[in-house]
Amino acid sequence: MRGRKRRRNDSQRFHRVQKLGKNHGGYHGETIDVRAVQRAIATAAQKQGWTAEVFHTQADFKWLALHRAPRHTANAPRLYLSAGIHGDEPAGPLAALRLLQENRWPVDAEIFLVPCLNPIGFTLNRRENAGGIDLNRDYRDSKSAEARAHIAWLERQPKFDFYLCLHEDWEAHGFYLYEQNPDHQPSLAEKMISAVEKVCPIDLSENIEGRPAHGGIIRPNHTPAERPDWPEAFYLITQKARRGYTLEAPSDFPLPTRVNALVAAVNAALDF
C-alpha cells in the first residue's frame, strides 16, 4: 500500500535477499498475466473441492469468491482471505494460487477466499481500477461497481473469526502487517512475523506509513469512524469480524520472495 516516504531502516535484519532498487515513485517490478492466474486459481480450487461463486463481471473478467467447507461443521472457525485489490501488487493473487495448489488448509476450518478484487487493475499495472478509483478506499460510501458487488457478497456471508487481506507496499524495507484487534483476542501477529522472517526481511522501522510500528507490527489506535474513506479491512472489522490482519509484502524485493512471505504468514495464521 502506498504511503508517505520513510527513511531507510538501518536496523533491518540481515537477510540474503536484497531490495532490487526498481521502485522509484511507484511499483516498477514484475507483472503478471492476470487472466492466466485467474484460470489457474479456478482450476486449483475445483481440483481441491472448493465451490466458486461469481459475484461480479466486467469486460471479460469474473470476480470469484471461493468457499471450502470444513470436515466437521460443529464449532468450525470461519476464516476470510482476500487479495489483488491493487493492480500493482501481484504477489497477492500468486500467493492465493499457491495456497490453493499446496492445499495445507486446516481441515476443520471454513475458508472464504476472494483471490483477485481488481483484475482490470492488473492489466493496467496500476493501483486503481479502470475508472481511476482506489478500491481499497471505497468501502464506506462505495462508488465503484467492484466494491459494491463485493460488499453485497460479504453481506450474504456469516461472521468470520478473523480475516487476512494480502497486500504489498512499494516503499517498504521489508514485510510488515497491521493488526485490528479491538477486543484483545489472542494475537496472531508475532507468529506470522516469526514465520515470514525465515523467507523475507522484516521492516523494523519505528514508524511505517506515519504510524508507530514495533517489530514489523502496526496496531492502529484510531477507529474506522474517524476516517471517511474506508479500506476493505475497515469494513471487515466493523461488519464481519473482530480480529483481522492486513499483510504487506515489500514489492521492491523479488516477486518469489514476496509470494513466499505472504504464504508463510497465512500458513502461520492458520496453524491452530
Question: What are these regions, as identified by a protein language model?
Answer:
Residues 2-272:
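Structured catalytic-domain cores with a bias toward divalent-metal coordination
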